[in-house]
Amino acid sequence: MAPANLPSIFNATSTDIEQLLAAQCHIGSKNLGVHMQPYLWKTRADGVNILNVGKTWEKIVLAARIIAAIDNPADICVISARPYGQRAVLKFAAHTGAQAIAGRFTPGSFTNYITRSFKEPRLIIVTDPRTDAQAIKEASYVNIPVIALCDADSPTEYVDVAIPTNNKGRHAIGCVWWMLAREVLRLRGTIYNRETPWDVMVDLYFYRDPEAEAEEKVEEEKLPGVEEEGVAAIESGFPATGDWEAAPAGFPATGEWSDAAPGAAAPNWDATAPATTADWAATEAKESSW
């Protein structure tokens, strides 16, 4: 890691570097753009480019100082069309007061004032310059500065501040957005000093599978006492007694269904038989005489 070009107060701690490495923020793509070469540390034998996490931290601090210089936090727009970054930008907006566009960017949001989604931000921050190309293109039309999380192969056209990091992994994206939000709050004074840890865990910025969240919600909403009473008791509303031979209330317990009830005579089926019908042949002969 190259020596930091920052004042000593902004130097990264060993914990910060360990978090960047644990989230694999240094793992770049196999392709390398010419404008991303200054942020390259080395290339592995398998062709994967390794980014310099020292440069990543310097750009995080620079971006945070730019964000903190804007008086109204609502004038900052954070954008992520990539699913892995949508949760991160929403949390960043909630903690810093910025506007979030998570999902598809509506064309004309920065240039067409007739649309309902029209915005006039003073700064935009995008998760991936490739997937958020429409937002960067419109920002260039109206002179909006752009901060972007750039991988080794990301296009840097119209990007003013590039934060070199892995922008395809959910842990890397969440970690960089979390560090950026923490640094902004430190510069604003929301976090008292740099020795005070932020009470928000980095896991809150990580992408979570919607199906996994739905399963966890079902587990949390499960009715209490299922283990004690049994599933059948919960569904039927009656406790499971385990005695299937017990008769329900209001009905006598009988041994065999073939046994006659006590005090009642067996029915005589011959006595109730219907009377014999007339001769069908004679009836038909009378009808034919007409």
From Swiss-Prot:
Residue ranges, compositional bias (Low complexity): 257-271
Subcellular compartments: Cytoplasm
One CC-aspect GO term: cytosolic small ribosomal subunit
SUPFAM superfamilies, alphabetized: Ribosomal protein S2 (SSF52313)
Record region (Disordered): 243-271
InterPro entries: Ribosomal_uS2 (IPR001865), Ribosomal_uS2_CS (IPR018130), Ribosomal_uS2_euk (IPR027498), Ribosomal_uS2_euk/arc (IPR005707), Ribosomal_uS2_flav_dom_sf (IPR023591)
Chief subcellular location: cytoplasm
PROSITE patterns, per database record: RIBOSOMAL_S2_2
Biological process, per Gene Ontology: cytoplasmic translation; ribosomal small subunit assembly
Keywords, ordered alphabetically: Cytoplasm, Ribonucleoprotein, Ribosomal protein
MF-aspect GO terms: structural constituent of ribosome
Task of the protein: Component of the ribosome, a large ribonucleoprotein complex responsible for the synthesis of proteins in the cell. The small ribosomal subunit (SSU) binds messenger RNAs (mRNAs) and translates the encoded message by selecting cognate aminoacyl-transfer RNA (tRNA) molecules. The large subunit (LSU) contains the ribosomal catalytic site termed the peptidyl transferase center (PTC), which catalyzes the formation of peptide bonds, thereby polymerizing the amino acids delivered by tRNAs into a polypeptide chain.
Summary of subunit composition and partner proteins: Component of the small ribosomal subunit (SSU). Mature N.crassa ribosomes consist of a small (40S) and a large (60S) subunit. The 40S small subunit contains 1 molecule of ribosomal RNA (18S rRNA) and at least 32 different proteins. The large 60S subunit contains 3 rRNA molecules (26S, 5.8S and 5S rRNA) and at least 42 different proteins. Interacts with rps21.
Record-stated family: Belongs to the universal ribosomal protein uS2 family.
Name of this chain's protein: Small ribosomal subunit protein uS11
High-level lineage: Eukaryota, Fungi, Dikarya, Ascomycota, Pezizomycotina
Originating gene: rps-0
